[in-house]
Amino acid sequence: MATETPAGGPLEARISRAEPKTDASATSEPATGDTTETPAATKPSAADGQTDGASEGFGGSQLQEPEYSVNVKLSDLQADPNNPLYSIKSFEELGLHPSILQGLHSMSFRRPSKIQEKALPLLLNNPPANMIGQSQSGTGKTAAFVLNILSRLDLSPQMELAPQALVLAPSRELARQIVGVIQVMGSYVDKLKVATAVPMESNRNQKVEAPVVVGTPGTVMDLIRKRLFNPQHLKVIVLDEADNMLDQQGLGDQCIRVKGLLPKNIQVVLFSATFPDHVVRYANKFAPNANQITLKHEELTVEGIKQLYLDCDSDEHKFDILVKFYGLLTIGSSIIFVKTRASAVEIERRMVAEGHTVVSLTGGVEGQKRDEIIDKFRQGDAKVLITTNVLARGIDVQTVSMVINYDIPELHAPKATKRIADAQTYLHRIGRTGRFGRVGVAVSFVASKEEWQMLQDIKTYFNTEIQRVNTQDWDEVEEVVKTIIRSSRAGSNFQRS
C-alpha cells in the first residue's frame, strides 16, 4: 500500500530552475473562484472561523503560554532585535485600523502571543519585508499573517475587487479554515471579500474578484493561466505550513511557478511550526533577505500536550485497544492518524461494524464530500475522525482533546535499511490538540521494536517525555487520560483576568 504523502524531492534544483516544466497536478484540479463577502449586517462568529489561537469560549489570548525563547534574525544586520520597535505587548501599539482591532477583540484576543509580539512589528513595517516565521502549533501564526494582510489592503472603489493578497495552503481543508479566520477577523472591515481557490468537482470558470485569495497552489496556478486571476496588484503572498509546501514533490514546483508569475517586489511570508535545516536553505531562496523568527527544535513540543504510548502485541491488538478507547475518544473530539488511505477506510469500516460512530477523511475523498466530513467533525456531529497526514497540519478544531498515532509517522525512504521516524509530522499531528495553551492528550500505539525505536528517536529529537501506559491495566489507562481531559475542560491552565 502506498503512503499518503510522497517524499520530498531535491528542492534546491527546482528553485534554481529558470522554467520548471509543467506538473500535471497543476492543471488537473478543476478550478473555482468562489468569492465570499462579509456583509456588515451578518458578522461571522469566532466559532464559524475555527480560529487559530482564539476562541471566546476558551478565553482567547488570555491563556498562558509555556516558557520558550523566540529567536529573531533581522535581514538588516545593523538593526538591534532587542529594540522595542521589534516587539510589542499590545495590539494597540501596532497602529491598526479600528475596524481590525474590533475584529480582534470580537475573537477574544486581548494581548499578542510570543510569535505575534515579535512577528507583527516586522510584518507591518514599511517598506514591507519578507519573513520566515516559526512557532509552536496553536500559538497564533494564522492570526499574525491575517493581520498583516488586512492592514495592507486598499479597498477603495478602484481596487476593492483587485486581488492584493494571496495565501497558499497544502490542503483544501486548511484553505477553507484560513478563509474562516480572515472573515471573522475582518468582519468589521467594510467591503472585504475573500475568494477561495480550491479543487472542486466542476469547473465554474469564475473570474477572481476579491482583494484576498486563499487556495491550493495547483488551483491558483490554473486560474492564473486561464486569465481568471490577475496577479499584477498582489502585495503579499503567504505560504502556510511552508516547510511542507516547499519540500513536497509537486507542491513545491507549483509554489515556485506561482511565485514566478507575481510582482517582483511582493512581500513573501512563510509560516510553519517546523523548518528542518534543509528546508530553511530553500526557504531563504524563496523569501530572500527575510526577517527570521525561529525556535530550537527542543522547544517545539507544546507543554500542554501530555504524550503517552501504549505497547500493543500486534497490529490486530492495536485495533482491539482502539475499540476499548472509544469511550475516551468521545469525551471531547479525537483524531486518529494512520499511515495509508486503505487503513483509514478499513478501520472506519470495522469500528462502524462494532457500533461506533466515526468518519474518515483522506486524500482519496473528493471535493464537496471532504467539506461535508470536516464540517460534520467541526460541528460535533462526529466526534472521532480517522485520517492520514492530509490533516496533520494546520487544522484547528477547538474541541479536539485527544490525538491517536495509530501508526507512528515515518519518512518514506526506499533505500533506508531501517524505518525512519518523521519527527516533524509527529509534532504537527499532536499539535491538533493542546491549541493555544489548552491541555490535550497524544497517544501513540507501538506494536513492534521498530515502532518503539522510532518513538524513542522522536523523544530524543524534541527532548520531551513520552510516558508508557500499561495496557494490561485498563483502569490505569482510563484514569490517566480522563484526568488530563478533565483538567482541560476545567480550564486548569487558564490565566483569568
Swiss-Prot record:
Residues 122-293 form the Helicase ATP-binding domain. It catalyses: ATP + H2O = ADP + phosphate + H(+). GO terms for cellular component: cytoplasm; nuclear membrane; nuclear pore. Pfam families: DEAD, Helicase_C. Residues 24-39 have a biased composition (Polar residues). Residues 304-477 form the Helicase C-terminal domain. It is a peripheral membrane protein. Residues 1-62 are annotated as: Disordered. The keyword Aminoacyl-tRNA synthetase does not apply. A motif (Q motif) lies at residues 89-117. It is found in: Cytoplasm; Nucleus, Nuclear pore complex; Nucleus membrane. ATP binds at S135, Q136, S137, G138, T139, G140, K141, T142. The Q motif is unique to and characteristic of the DEAD box family of RNA helicases and controls ATP binding and hydrolysis. ATP-dependent RNA helicase associated with the nuclear pore complex and essential for mRNA export from the nucleus. May participate in a terminal step of mRNA export through the removal of proteins that accompany mRNA through the nucleopore complex. May also be involved in early transcription. This is ATP-dependent RNA helicase DBP5. The gene is DBP5.
